[in-house]
Amino acid sequence: MVVGAFPIAKLLYLGVRQLSKPVANRIKAGARRSEFFKNYICLPPAQAYHWIEMRTKMRIMGFRGSTIKPLNEDAAAELGAELLGEAIIFVIGGGCMVLEYSRQAANSRRKEEELAQSITSLQTQLGELALTTETLDAQIREVNRLLLSLPAAPSSK
């Protein structure tokens, strides 16, 4: 019974993705507690996201030129923390995809190299067989020439 290779890399990637959610939640909680993190990491992307979202909604509804009020600090911090958490999960997922792609590319490259090596080996064997065939053909011609040059043996009855 042949047992296939255990896909340890895929299991590892799945584990990393599952661990990324609690890590993202802890980072979000830390972002809510830290003033520096809140003011410089969470608030600017949250306000930008809010501005873009509201501007898009206003344009879809047909309102032009209306001013958009910024979010209050607590709502912006919460939205920024959520955006940060989603970005972390997205980056980890993207990293897993890149690693899987590179692993698959390495496997494909290895298989192509093995195939090229096999083809080269077969070509070498074919060349050797052609040389052997030519040698045997020359020997057969030599034997035929010698047979034809022998005097005919008298038949005895």
From Swiss-Prot:
The keyword Nucleotide-binding does not apply. Keywords: Coiled coil, Mitochondrion. May play some role in mitochondrial processes. It comes from Danio rerio (Zebrafish). The gene is opa3. It is found in: Mitochondrion. It comes from the Eukaryota. Residues 103-129 form a coiled coil. Belongs to the OPA3 family. GO terms for cellular component: mitochondrion. One of its GO terms (biological process) is locomotory behavior. This is Optic atrophy 3 protein homolog.
